[in-house]
Every structure is written in structure tokens, then in C-alpha cells.
Amino acid sequence: MTKAPVAPVVLVILDGWGYCEEKRGNAIVAAKTPIVDSLWAAYPHTLIRTSGKAVGLPEGQMGNSEVGHLNIGAGRVVPQELVRISDAVEDGSIALNPALVKICQEVRSRNSKLHLVGLCSEGGVHSHITHLFGLLDLAKNQQIPEVCIHAITDGRDTAPTDGVRAITMLQNYIDRTGIGRIVTLSGRYYAMDRDHRWDRVKRAYDVMTQDGVGDNRTAVEILQASYAEGVKDEFVNPIRIAPGAIEPGDGVIFFNFRPDRSRQLTQALVSPTFNGFERQQITPLSFVTFTQYDSDLPVAVAFEPQNLSNILGEVIANHGLNQFRTAETEKYAHVTYFFNGGLEEPFAGEDRELVSSPMVATYDHAPAMSAVAVTDVAIAAIQKGTYSLVVINYANPDMVGHTGQIDATITAIETVDRCLGRLLESVIKAGGTTIITADHGNAEYMLDDGGNPWTAHTTNPVPFILVEGEKVKIPGYGTNVELRSDGKLSDIAPTILEILQLPQPPEMTGRSLLKTADYELQRTRTPVQVGL
């Protein structure tokens, strides 16, 4: 006997689609979004929090894609690495960290160099400059003879020219403590690529590993000259400032805590099977990463991963149900690795499909990105009728929003809106439920108070829309479904479990966003017409 098709819950994550009533610099308000507008008018909706303590970050700290997907998938507020490491720096326990102490001992015994590599930024998304200061203090206490800093500039999670401020802070700390020197400078566009654009990574790798005469200017002077040429922090050309190449026998600490944009450079430096570009492996090389970038890398890890049990994907799998994940390259790790609590391997019954992102320098040149192809893949999965949960990420609002180009971001938003229309038609035909939300804000705030481009994330809430192909009915409440107004990202997984009529495990401490506890799916419903 043929099984009846499964009516899925489809979770659509509009990456970087925040909510803000201010119209100035708001690409979402400026865009024509008839699909989202009609859904917001016709279906239960609310706003949820995606920043600060609501997602395990310090109060006032903007959220990001890693944190967002981690909280969504875990169904609980997950203490973030930023907080863990900052606490270790503040209370001094970083000085006792076994992996960090060991690498210092190895460097000292060989009388070699210690290299500190990472994003010099106050953004708090991939790193924090205070963590670098903590490492300098550690190196001084460990009496390391030579400390070389390979500084990566931000301009994406911070203002485009905040690099001067960050590098000035760093140089002042070096001068005050008397340890360390900045030996290379590189924009994150090169050193932190995550899309296998190995030509970019190679440029950063080469300046870090090939010694030679340095530039006779200071790091700040180099940045100021770069700005004068229209090249801001993110895109600063890799440059050697002073002697101090990474050589055999040295030690390296990569102090970024977010894995996705740290993985490729680390692979180039340590992997014996690396083939992204031609290079001579540096060996022996002691190497510590702040967090686990990839379980297959031959490195020590300073802050081991937290083990999260009974997360959404695991619960779905444990009940014998199938699930599907898709996104384009830029956000694929988020709907897989991060959504699964930092696990690389899929759960039983979990299928995935990666859609390649377009090969362009920046996504304002291709604001549609691969949204149409992602939609095609998702529709095909829904039409199979075997998946109880389908998770989709649309990267456009975030990735194009990061360019600071408002017109291109408007195009990106409108592209996603059209794709949503097609997607929803397939969910309705399947008798499923669609949840439309976001992981953090971005595209709704693209100009700062001074009218300058804002390319970072925001602390704004994001929309949450519950869309049934047929109107939701709750016993005793008819079609009057209400959603809580105090929700956060960790409440999404419990909501999905309630819709699927699956028990919520005790480890999952989020609360369903449905105000009523006796929500049930009914076979007989009154169709609602939305302008699709």
C-alpha cells in the first residue's frame, strides 16, 4: 500500500530580513513585497528577538547567522563562544587553558615565533579584539620571545573604516605591554573566504608565509592610504608590514571563534592533503584554533565545542521522520552544521542539497544570487511528499545587504519575495505549514545616523509568520490563532514540534510561540486565499 504524502512543516529563513519602521535606509520597506505583505495581513504573525541575551550573547550584541541558526535548531538559548571566551579573558582563566599553555611552552622550548592570526574587530561576530589582548598578556606571562600578529580587517560586521580604530587600539596595547608586532595586514575578503575562492585565500596565505622586506609604513598609514583609494577594511589588499613569516617550528593561534570563515585559511596552513592552490606545507607547525573549525583538522582546540542533545533535527530523526535542508553556498553551513548544533554529519533521514552561489566579486553584482535555484530544489523536495520538515535559507537580504548597496538590496528583497510566492504554492498543494522568519536583521538598516552606509547586522527583531495552506483551526478557538509577542529564536523549534504533534524534550527549553497549548492540525479547514 502506498503511503500518503507527508504534509510538511517548511521553515523559511530569510537571512538578514529584520523589522524596522524607519523608512530611511530601509531596503525592505523600499522594496515591493506583495507576497510577504499579503501574508503579514492574512496570517498569524509576531516579532521575535535575535540579539543579545535572547540568543546567548552579551546584552546589546547584534546577532548573526551562526548564532541564529544554532538557537533555532537547538530550541534553547545557547551560550555563545563570544561570552565563553570573553569570560575566560576577564577572569584570567585563559592563562590556564591547556591548549594555549602547551603551544606557548613548545614555542619557548624551540626559541621560535608565536603567530596570532585573526580578525581585529570589535564586531563580536567572528572574533573580538579583547581576545587578542588576552593572548598578548598570555604570551608575555609565558615569556615568548617573538610574537607576530597577522591582522585581518573587518568592515563587514563593523563600519567600513573602523579598521583604523581597531588597529590603533591594538598598537596602543602593544606599546603599553611591550609585546608583539603587527607583521601583516589583510582584508577579510581574502583571509576569511568561505566559498572556495582559493585565489583570494592564497593572497593572504602568501603574505603570512613568505618573508621579505616589509612596507615602511605603519598599519594605520597603510589603511588610510587604502581608504584614499576607495578600498575599505573588508577588501584591504594583503600586505607584509614587517618581517615575521610563519615558518617550520613556529606556533600559530587562530583566535577567530566562528568556524565557517576560518576553516579555509587553516586548511591551507595545516592540512597535509590540501589542494586548493600550490603551496609547500609548513612542518612542523604547532597550531591552536580557538574553537573547533573542523574535526578533521590536525590542530589543538582551546575551547572545545559544547554538546547539545535533543536538538530539532535529532528529535525529528528519533521519531523516524525525514527532513530536508537546502541553501546556497554562502548559507549552506548554517542550515546544516550550525542548525545541527555544530555536528558535521546529517541525522538519519536528513537529506541535504547545496546550491552553488554565483561567482562574483560582491553580490551587489548579482543580487538575485541563487534564490531561484534554491526555490526549485525546495519545491522538488516538497513534491516528493516524504519530508516532515523542510528547512530553506534565502541568503540574499544578508549577503547583498552587506555590500551597502541599497538599490541592489532592494532587488534582492524583491527576488526573494517572488520566490516565496512559488514556494508557498507548493506547500499549499502539499497541505503543509510554512513558517517564515529570519535569523537576524541587516537589510532593514543600511544607513547610519550620519547617512553613511551601514554594512553590519542589527539588533532589530525579525518577523515570524505562520502560514497554513488552509486556515489554522484550534479546538475551541476556531481560526483565531494568536502568537506570543515575547518570543525569540529558540522558540521556533518547540513551535515546529507542536505543529508536528511531537513531544518537546526537556533539554529544549524554548516555548512554543502558539498561545494555546492544544494546537492540533485538522483535516478539514477553510481555505484562505492569499495573493500568490
From Swiss-Prot:
Quote the pathway field.
Carbohydrate degradation; glycolysis; pyruvate from D-glyceraldehyde 3-phosphate: step 3/5
Does the keyword section mention Transferase? no
Instruction: List the EC numbers from the record.
Output: 5.4.2.12
User: What keywords are assigned to this protein?
Assistant: Glycolysis, Isomerase, Manganese, Metal-binding
The catalytic residues are 65
Q: Which CDD domains match?
A: iPGM
The prosthetic group or cofactor this protein requires is: Mn(2+)
Q: How is the cofactor bound?
A: Binds 2 manganese ions per subunit.
Tell me the protein's name.
Answer: 2,3-bisphosphoglycerate-independent phosphoglycerate mutase
Tell me which species this is from: Nostoc punctiforme (strain ATCC 29133 / PCC 73102)
Organism phylogeny: Bacteria, Bacillati, Cyanobacteriota, Cyanophyceae, Nostocales
Gene name of this polypeptide: gpmI
